[in-house]
């Protein structure tokens, strides 16, 4: 078993029989505890986490292909969801390392706190670009491309030409936008942003539209979809994509790399807590 920098070895699958899925949707949920109870029932044979709130859900799960297929079908079709998740997109990748050790379904006030009150992203996907459209946008002269992730993620990998807002948490992003939005408008720049799976960008875009009357172009499905659907993604993607699970990082082909949590966080005092958490989760 390969030990990727921790005191105890991680669970490593002998074959790529384990898969990871990421999914989210902003949708009005009236009874979040009831929805969470149904999700707990549907994930009894899976590992990972799902957050449920009045604004929707956000999840990452791992398991065998058949179990994930059953969950995906149920989330889209189970009558107990009243069609709230019909057509929801899933981003799937094969695993070598087991991403999670347990299953958690929690009810929260928000599935993704931006740190700004009153942001409503339900039914407001904004301007979504598919991978081909995103590639064309990267070559445009009038676009500022913002990496809507934490700075340590940007350092590990990024799209060519992207700007690092230098934030340590999603809740820090509004301050970056507030400082720069007047300049973008004065220069006549279009604003585009990307994140790992798309959820950060969708919520940020809703806020920026309301606060600054600014329409934001987003990479639909995020980095994960781009890498999955673009055979030559390495032309645009530089480095590795950080993921918030025990795999740590993926290359442009969505393959796990040898990067460890210590490689990502070591030397950054502000991120020491993340390293400690990663080590703790890997040891459980």
Where are these regions (language model features)?
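Structural scaffold elements adjacent to functional motifs in cytosolic proteins
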Residues: 145-147
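Cofactor-cradling patches in redox/metallo enzymes
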Residues: 194
């Amino acid at each position: 078993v390969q030990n990727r920098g921790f005191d105890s070895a991680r669970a490593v699958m002998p074959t790529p029989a384990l898969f990871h899925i990421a999914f989210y949707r902003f949708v009005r949920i009236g009874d979040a505890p009831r929805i969470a109870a149904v999700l707990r029932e549907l994930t009894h044979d899976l590992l990972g986490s799902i957050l449920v709130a009045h604004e929707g859900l956000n999840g990452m799960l791992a398991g065998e292909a058949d179990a994930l297929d059953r969950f995906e079908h149920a989330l889209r079709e189970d009558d107990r969801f009243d069609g709230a998740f019909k057509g929801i997109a899933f981003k799937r990748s094969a695993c070598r390392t087991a991403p999670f050790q347990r299953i958690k379904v929690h009810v929260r006030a928000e599935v993704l706190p931006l740190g700004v009150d009153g942001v409503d992203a339900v039914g407001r996907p904004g301007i979504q670009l598919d991978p081909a459209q995103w590639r064309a946008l990267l070559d445009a002269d009038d676009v500022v491309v913002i990496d809507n992730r934490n700075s340590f993620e940007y350092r590990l990998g990024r799209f060519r030409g992207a700007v690092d807002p230098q934030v340590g948490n999603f809740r820090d992003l509004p301050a970056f936008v507030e400082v720069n939005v007047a300049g973008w408008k004065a220069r006549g720049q279009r604003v585009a942003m990307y994140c790992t799976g798309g959820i950060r960008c969708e919520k940020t875009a809703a806020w920026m539209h309301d606060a600054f009357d600014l329409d934001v172009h987003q990479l639909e499905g995020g980095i994960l979809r781009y890498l999955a659907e673009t055979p030559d993604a390495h032309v645009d993607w530089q480095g590795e994509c950080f993921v918030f699970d025990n795999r740590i990082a993926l290359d442009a082909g969505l393959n796990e790399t040898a990067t460890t949590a210590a490689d990502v966080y070591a030397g950054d005092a502000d991120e020491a807590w993340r390293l400690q958490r990663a080590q703790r989760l890997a040891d459980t």
